[in-house]
A protein has these predicted regions:
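Mg2+/Mn2+-dependent nuclease catalytic core
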Residues: 54-76, 82
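Domain-level recognition of nuclease-like catalytic cores that cleave nucleotide substrates
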Residues: 82-109
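Acidic-basic catalytic patches of nuclease active cores, encompassing PD-(D/E)XK
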Residues: 1-25
């Protein structure tokens, strides 16, 4: 199983459990990927998933650096060029020691 797939599966189950409809998993473009794309009512939500079984090596949320955010933004732009949308947002799901934190409306710097 690919690194991170276990956490993405937990995130999908969580999102579906709160009523989101997952429409893409691991959406690839030439510069990177978007972990999950889902619908929250009429809003398309791009979801970045980070997880860790422990926090012994730091918090999973701290693994998103500027370069990762730039690649993610370019992938979102690629998706929006292919599928023009007006109502969308970026969320993050951080899984620490099996606990899920859902951060809605993450700002891209």
């Amino acid at each position: 199983m690919r690194k991170g797939a276990e956490f993405e599966e937990l995130a999908v189950k969580y999102l579906e459990g709160i009523g989101y409809k997952v429409i893409h998993r691991n959406y690839h473009c030439r510069v990177g990927e978007i972990d999950i794309i889902a619908l929250d009512g009429g809003t398309v939500v791009f979801v970045e998933v980070k997880g860790g079984k422990t926090t012994d090596f730091g918090d999973p949320a701290e693994r998103v650096d500027r370069k990762k955010m730039e690649r993610l933004l370019r992938c979102i732009e690629h998706y929006l060029h292919k599928y023009p949308l007006e109502d969308y947002r970026l969320d993050a799901i951080v899984i620490r020691n099996g606990e899920i934190e859902h951060i809605k409306g993450v700002e891209l710097y």
